[in-house]
Amino acid sequence: MSTPNTHLLCLIATDLRKHFFAVLVGMLIVCSAIYNVYTTHKTRGLVTQIERLAQDKDDLMMEWRNLLIEEHTLDEHSRIRRIALKKLSMSQATKKNSVLVELR
């Protein structure tokens, strides 16, 4: 005596053997779709990472330019001080050679 479950399993197995190529193509399509979703997800993550790195690069370039400006500014002050010391024989004021002028 065969049970309905056994009969159903036999029918499914027969159909799978009979339409093996169609089942295989269907499974490949599903796998391809899942891989497509995975690839799209990874691509979006990489694009986000590239944009973040580009922003970091821009921030670092701006900081570099600001540091160069600061370096040139500080260098200009030391250049003026050096010229004042050598060519004009100027020196830093001390308490002895400073004069306090009071306003009345």
Curated annotation (Swiss-Prot):
Location relative to the cell: Cell inner membrane
Keywords linked to the UniProt accession: Cell cycle, Cell division, Cell inner membrane, Cell membrane, Membrane, Transmembrane, Transmembrane helix
Membrane topology per record: Single-pass type II membrane protein
TM region positions: 20-39
Subunit organization: Part of a complex composed of FtsB, FtsL and FtsQ.
Protein task: Essential cell division protein. May link together the upstream cell division proteins, which are predominantly cytoplasmic, with the downstream cell division proteins, which are predominantly periplasmic.
Family from the record: Belongs to the FtsL family.
Protein name: Cell division protein FtsL
Species annotation: Psychromonas ingrahamii (strain DSM 17664 / CCUG 51855 / 37)
